[in-house]
From Swiss-Prot:
Family annotation (SUPFAM superfamilies): Ribosomal protein S7 (SSF47973)
Family named by the database record: Belongs to the universal ribosomal protein uS7 family.
Organism: Nostoc punctiforme (strain ATCC 29133 / PCC 73102)
Domain of life: Bacteria
Lineage: Bacteria, Bacillati, Cyanobacteriota, Cyanophyceae, Nostocales
GO BP annotations listed: translation
Name listed for the protein in its UniProt record: Small ribosomal subunit protein uS7
Amino acid sequence: MSRRGVIQRRPVPSDSVYNSRLVSMIIRRIMRHGKKSLAARIVYEALKTIEERTGNGALETFERAVRNATPLVEVKARRVGGATYQVPMEVRSERGTTLALRWLVQYSRSRPGRTMASKLANELMDAANETGNAIRKREETHRMAEANKAFAHYRY
């Protein structure tokens, strides 16, 4: 058994504008090459666009988008006697949120459009309305878990 201690996860500080951990997390996810101020500008611009287009609170729409894109189950590869099985596992809330943000940013980047802020705004609005590629990815993940339900007893 390992003698190393368990690493404590550092809490993510809230962002200064919306005072939200989720906004801070998506800023970090969008950031490339250490350019955090650019990432923050993109996120705040996207949230401003959402507020202008929907009329609702931008933070509320963003939180709904993340909640809709969060998976409940996923499959993990487990090797048993020479065969690799896709074993369905429940997703912890922290990992679910991380996956949702990762998918939202990934599919925002792959969208057609001019600016990253507009692409992110469109993806977030789609996710809030239960459409979009991030939601499709969550549904696909759930389908994979459902299809491999027979291997659930290999859970570890």
